[in-house]
C-alpha cells in the first residue's frame, strides 16, 4: 500500500518518491498546495476504488493520515 500511495503522491506533486514519507505534509513539501491536494484525493480515490468523505479530507494533515483512513476503509493493497 505504501509504495502505491507514494507513487501516486510522487506523480501528483511531481517530486521524487524519496522525498515522501509518512511525515510529509504541506509544511515540508512545497508542491503540496490546495489544488494539488484535491488532485491527489481524486487520484487516490480512483486507484483504490474508494471515496473520501468531507470529514476525512479535513483530517489529512500529512501522508500518514491517508494510511489511517485506508485502515478505516479496510484497504490493504
Where are the regions that the model predicts?
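Phosphopantetheine-dependent thiolation modules in NRPS/PKS and related acyl-activating systems
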Residues: 1-41, 46-77
Amino acid at each position: 500500500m505504501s509504495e502505491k500511495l507514494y507513487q501516486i503522491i510522487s506523480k501528483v506533486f511531481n517530486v521524487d518518491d524519496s522525498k515522501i514519507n509518512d511525515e510529509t505534509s504541506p509544511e515540508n513539501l512545497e508542491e503540496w498546495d490546495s489544488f494539488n491536494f484535491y488532485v491527489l484525493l481524486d487520484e487516490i480515490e480512483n486507484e483504490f476504488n474508494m471515496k473520501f468523505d468531507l470529514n476525512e479530507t479535513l483530517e489529512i494533515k500529512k501522508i500518514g493520515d491517508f494510511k489511517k483512513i485506508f485502515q478505516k476503509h479496510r484497504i490493504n493493497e
